[in-house]
Amino acid sequence: MADRVLVVVQRYGDVAGGAETHARQLVQQLRPHCDVTVATTTARDYWTWENAFVAGEDRVDGVVVHRFPVAQGRAPDFRRYERAAFRAGHTLADEHAFIDAQGPIAPELLEFVHQRGREYTSVLFFTYIYAPTVYGVPLVPERAILVPTAHDEPAIGLAAYRQVFHTPRALAFNTVEERDMVHRRFHNERIPHDVVGVGVDVPATADGDRFRAAHGITGPYFLYVGRIVESKGCPELFAHWARFKARHDGPATLALVGHREMDVPERSDVRYLGPLSDAEKFDALAGCTALTYSGLLDSLSMIVLEAWAMGKPVVVSSRAPVLSSMSRRAGAGLPYGSATEFAELLELLLERPTLARQLGAAGRAFVAGTYTWPGVVQKYLDLFAEVRARNV
């Protein structure tokens, strides 16, 4: 009998977000093997959690999606709750007030999990930090599989999150680094777990010249893909780029792809291209010298994996524990610790294209050996079997 799997995630469908994209891709990959249903909110954006989708039963990519209204989005004075939860001498009540103020609070979603969660053999909860997971996991602990998408941030140190990491029947990690960090912090090795990851698919027809022609870019370019926002390290990226151009008088361009949530430098060597389709994104990757990624707190970066799968090196901050460690393991990335090192690494890649190709080839091999959908799906099926066996 096929497993019946419920996926609980804070947003689902045509929404921007790493965990949400991960969940949607996984659901599609599991469909041939399981009866999969999704429970989510009606929110489209993660900041306000404003109700944007229609509540009720929906279908996305042929999958039944139950959407429940957000009763409380992010509090207007959220920062006040955040400060209270992280100050010295705070209480557990302060921590739960922070979780509630962060949103999304969706009582009908939790009631669905409570009333119908045991109709499923496994319940996958995506992302540890939000209320649907914090309050949902304890409702079906014997069926819960947590996909924490965790990184070493202040919130994970709050006592209110301990039960989230100790209650599930199993945990599915994205990387070795995420697993090791969670085990160091929570000492929960006893819970069945695996480094499952996510699959990476790239087109064989990506064309860098097509991207250049479409956007009028000549000469070498470095690429950033993602939300252009302070929390992703973009101010540092822009400052480091200016330092690089001050010492490098060549024609290199920084191409920015994604939603802009902050000002972009008005420079002729910085091109903001806005959000692009997947096809255009892969064209951009095909033509770039390297991907630059400035985020520090990712549990996994899909764009880094996609760059490697396309045979491109990545330049990442040495202060990003997961990505810098993965870059070393893959032999496909160059971590920088300062603006000077950033500039030196970009110059190195421009001056030594053979090295860039070698790094990219190592990245392609790393992804092919680690992040393929057949392997990912089998690991999830094994976790489902583990949960099912323990509930007989």
Labelled PLM ranges:
Residues 313-317:
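Short hydrophobic beta-strand element within catalytic cores of glycosyltransferases
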Residues 332-340, 348-353:
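Conserved acidic donor-binding segment of nucleotide-sugar-dependent glycosyltransferases
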Residues 41-117:
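A conserved catalytic-core segment of Leloir-type glycosyltransferases
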Residues 258-282, 290:
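Nucleotide-activated donor-binding/catalytic signature segment of Leloir-type glycosyltransferases, i.e.
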Residues 296:
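Aromatic "clamp/platform" in nucleotide-sugar-dependent glycosyltransferases that forms part
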Residues 6, 214-232, 238-242:
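Conserved donor-binding/catalytic core segment of Leloir-type glycosyltransferases
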Residues 143-154, 161-207, 217:
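Donor nucleotide-sugar binding/catalytic pocket of nucleotide-sugar-dependent glycosyltransferases
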Residues 348, 355-370, 379:
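A short, well-ordered alpha-helix in the C-terminal region of glycosyltransferases
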